[in-house]
Amino acid sequence: ALAVEKLILAEVRAAEVFKIIIPQGSMWMIENSNQFDNITEIIVENGGIIKIAENATLILTQASYITVMPGGSIMGKGTIYMTNSSAGFTNYNAGIIDCGLLKIDGGGSGVDFMNYGTLKLNSYRASTAGTTLTNHGTIEAVIIDGNNNTHIKNGCYLKTDKFQFGTLVMGNTSEAICKELTGNGNDNNIVMEAQSMLTCTGKANLFRTVTGPTQ
């Protein structure tokens, strides 16, 4: 539902890409579920806000994806749900995403979700093979739950209670803190680059190869 539909001021169709732009001073309230198909880019500009109510879902299917610019935000207790791995289009957050669940599943060859801002979640769940969560900002989540074929590249700060993934790469000077580092039945790797730090305050299952750090 578009509770504040008149504030969605810009819809641009170019090169077969349909763009929904939430500009400064505008808010889009999702109270139930909204689904976007084919090639749709949702852009949250500086000062724009998407609010997803509890039990509501923003669904992005096929080649649909999101771009949150610095100063933009997606807030609420609801869900962002990506199917078909955005057909290879990169999802990008340089603002704030603070919601209940970020879920990536379905077919496709995986999706890159790039975080250069703040990503706060109750749960991150990824099951599409090849999906990579790349962090150059701050990620705080209660649960990070990826299967054997999903990956995390952390270049800055990440904190979670449960930490499960296929392959983890810790970039230079990066830090990750978890309460439980779980196994997932696959001997995937953890790569620690120079001056990176991975801290587990509780149970750690290291059925995997850990390389580094060398400095």
PLM regions and their residue ranges:
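Extracellular beta-strand-rich, repetitive "passenger/adhesive" scaffolds
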Residues: 1-215
